[in-house]
């Protein structure tokens, strides 16, 4: 569960990008956040793992399986590091190492679980390799395991990035415009991957997305932002012309 209670964010130049954000996101939801560029979508996501600090209000995260409780404004040091290990973060950039194989790229998600010399030299235990291979298998990417990342298409590279995120074994995935650089067919495939992970693994997923049609097709809930405020929060079927006008204006 993620609780935003009257959250505000003001940049040093005085521009307020989040205004009185109050919402609750429950375990197992697939939430699409939509709105114009500059509406506050990316800032909202980056407050969850404290990449962006908030100016006022509170954000509380509870992970049911581990019973870990985080008050974000008070979370720092090792506890913040522990929180970030539980949250998979994706963006429109693939962040793959071009001259490494797909498997090597996915294994990078396991670096934080290594200790001592193993962490320095990049030696991974059998257990970590099985986790990485299982993540590739979930996305039907096993056949690409020993192919270099720079030999893949953009859609395949984004799916490798998703496999790497899965290998992190997160409780929550937040994705910032993960399909913005993809053509419609590949964008649908990646969104379908998110949907399958959400349903089969029970991982909560929050996605910033410009494609309203994809938000309506794959999300269980849509949040619309306009000028830093929540102006829509409902199931996709309620996203009618009136709601779109609130989110995007005339």
Swiss-Prot record:
Keyword Protein biosynthesis listed? The answer is: no
Primary localization class, coarse: membrane
Could you say which residues bind ATP here?
35-42
EC annotation? 7.3.2.2
- Main EC class of this protein? translocase
Topology class, membrane: Peripheral membrane protein
Keywords (alphabetical) are: ATP-binding, Cell membrane, Membrane, Nucleotide-binding, Phosphonate transport, Translocase, Transport
- Domain ABC transporter intervals: 2-247
Q: Which InterPro entries match?
A: AAA+_ATPase, ABC_transporter-like_ATP-bd, ABC_transporter-like_CS, ABC_transpr_PhnC, MetN_ABC_transporter-like, P-loop_NTPase
* Any Pfam family matching the protein: ABC_tran
Kindly list the places in or outside the cell where this protein is found, as annotated in its UniProt entry.
Answer: Cell membrane
Q: Which GO terms describe its molecular function?
A: ABC-type phosphonate transporter activity; ATP binding; ATP hydrolysis activity
Matching SUPFAM superfamilies, A to Z? Answer: P-loop containing nucleoside triphosphate hydrolases
Q: Which reaction does it catalyse?
A: phosphonate(out) + ATP + H2O = phosphonate(in) + ADP + phosphate + H(+)
Please verify whether the record's keywords include Transmembrane: no
An annotated GO cellular component of this protein is: plasma membrane
Subunit record text: The complex is composed of two ATP-binding proteins (PhnC), two transmembrane proteins (PhnE) and a solute-binding protein (PhnD).
Query: Of which family is this protein a member?
Result: Belongs to the ABC transporter superfamily. Phosphonates importer (TC 3.A.1.9.1) family.
Its biological purpose is as follows:
Part of the ABC transporter complex PhnCDE involved in phosphonates import. Responsible for energy coupling to the transport system.
What name is this protein filed under?
Phosphonates import ATP-binding protein PhnC
The gene it comes from is phnC
